[in-house]
């Protein structure tokens, strides 16, 4: 299957892609520190949060551009997309579970719409910034990096999804700078599962834009601004097992299907 992977055609070496990922991730993480000279009193005000959101979006766009450049300037996983065939039934089940997950998010979207105009704009800007940059960093550049490294392995898609999603989850430990360990650890677990879901979407669609849109939609929440706790451990574990489990199963079955198709 390696010959059909877009990442194997990338002119950048593994070391160049790795350095690019590390540098761009650090820049993205530190984006909130750029306006430190304005002082906490202003930055915690409505205008301050809006300004930070605008700066975050600008930096996110720049990082996303360079991430895609080092990923090979392509949104594809496969050079030629392999049809799902009999795997469609599992894809349908995956879509149902994702729909239920987003249906549960609807209450947060309603909460956002009841906030002030400035707060709504701030939340939307932050969601777009995160959706764009994090997808192009983790589901484009890092995923492609792992597919290039593991291109000779049979289950390259599965391992690339697992490793990039674990990195995506671990990256959220930077939030320890502003919140306690329990909240952060909950985020790491939840985000790792969401990362698997987004990898599944990218693999099945052979594109980037649907998972960018879904990431943005997932981040449209009042919690983006307030930083409140995610929820109870039971809810985190159950939802993580459901979405992470169905994502892993879908990728594994599709990866196996791709191997069989390549032998024909």
Show which residues each predicted segment covers.
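Juxtamembrane helix-loop-helix connectors linking adjacent transmembrane helices
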Residues: 9-15, 39-51, 68-137, 143-149, ...
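N-terminal, membrane-interfacial amphipathic/helix-forming hydrophobic leader that caps
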Residues: 1-76, 220-223, 227-264
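Interfacial helix-loop-helix junctions of multi-pass membrane proteins
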Residues: 173-189
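Membrane-interface helix/loop boundary segments of multi-pass membrane proteins
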Residues: 136-163, 203-207
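Functionally important transmembrane alpha-helices
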Residues: 184-240
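Aromatic-anchored segments of alpha-helical transmembrane domains
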Residues: 24-33, 97-105, 165-174, 216-226
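Hydrophobic cores of alpha-helical transmembrane segments in multi-pass inner/ER membrane proteins
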Residues: 56-67, 94-97, 126-140, 196, ...
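Active-site His/Glu-centered metal-binding helix of metallohydrolases
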Residues: 132-137, 141-142, 146, 170, ...
